[in-house]
């Protein structure tokens, strides 16, 4: 893309839940990193959600609704079950924190985040981008909890409920404008 500086891209830093920290210099081909992040997310989903998928597909077959069957790629691409991305940036385009300060603040925040919410929210990967106008971090996580069958499944609202988050307006029904994600996002901003 036009806004990416290939020389500065060499300073990008990457982390994922299976391999830990990496840099753009290893592996030397930056395209491998995108594939690797996709692979990391697929591997996490296969490890954690295959039993749910297989059992749900069996239940669908028993009631003759195999058209409802899903696969790991379906979970990864569905708006309701795919990893969620958060972008962290300190400051503006003209006045922003250094990459070192951003990395320090966000890694400390992610550690607190995992300690507090890690039972139901899993940080899969993140990337510190130095190759654009301002340093920023793309972080991806997934929400999950046990369903009524005792299977761990990706489900944001139920995971947040299990973590004790309330609706912003408990007197109103769950809706697009009244959901636990709103309360969770506010708690994360306060924690950061």
Where do the model's predicted regions map?
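N-terminal nicking endonuclease/strand-transfer module with a His-rich metal-binding environment
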Residues: 1-192
